[in-house]
């Protein structure tokens, strides 16, 4: 497992050929505009657990996008694997470990969430303190 993480990180570093300052994981339907962007589909990444099966979550582009924001190199993970899709927790966490081995200074994770609080509007920033695991 660890060797696959290292090999995947090395593949991404070689593919984009620039240091990566920050990484962002986008949730369903969320986009991010980058300057000078390049893309790499998950299916093209050797050893990536998600390249064997199509991700079934609507709104996930299933690709890495590399580019710049305010002069900083940013890697965007457009979609991720989910435990409820039948992936193991190791598979779900795989790209987070890869990002760590890319040497980024920070990782920002977004998601689409539902709430019962009627004061929330689309696009609000919320802090999750609990969730429902529908896969028990």
Where are these regions (language model features)?
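N-terminal short beta-loop-beta anion/metal-coordinating cradle
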Residues: 1-88, 133
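N-terminal cationic-hydrophobic initiation segments that often serve targeting/anchoring roles
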Residues: 13-16, 100, 117
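Hydrophobic/aromatic beta-strand patches that form the interior of the parallel beta-sheet core
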Residues: 75-77, 108, 126
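Proline- and acidic/polar-enriched loop/turn elements at helix boundaries
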Residues: 79, 111-112
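C-terminal binding/interaction regions
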Residues: 92-93
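Non-catalytic positions within long, well-ordered alpha-helices that form the structural scaffold/packing
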Residues: 99-103, 108
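Phosphate/pyrophosphate-binding betaalpha-module
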Residues: 113-136
């Amino acid at each position: 497992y660890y060797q696959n993480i290292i090999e995947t990180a090395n593949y991404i570093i070689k593919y984009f050929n620039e240091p990566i300052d920050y990484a962002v994981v986008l949730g369903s339907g969320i986009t991010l505009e980058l300057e000078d962007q390049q893309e790499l589909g998950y299916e093209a990444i050797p050893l990536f657990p998600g390249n064997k099966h199509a991700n079934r979550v609507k709104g996930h582009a299933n690709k890495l996008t590399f580019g710049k924001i305010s002069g900083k190199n940013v890697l965007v993970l457009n979609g991720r694997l989910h435990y409820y899709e039948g992936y193991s927790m190791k598979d779900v966490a795989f790209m987070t470990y890869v990002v760590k081995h890319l040497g980024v200074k920070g990782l920002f994770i977004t998601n689409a969430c539902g709430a019962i609080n009627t004061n929330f509007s689309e696009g609000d920033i919320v802090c999750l303190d609990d969730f429902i695991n529908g896969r028990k």
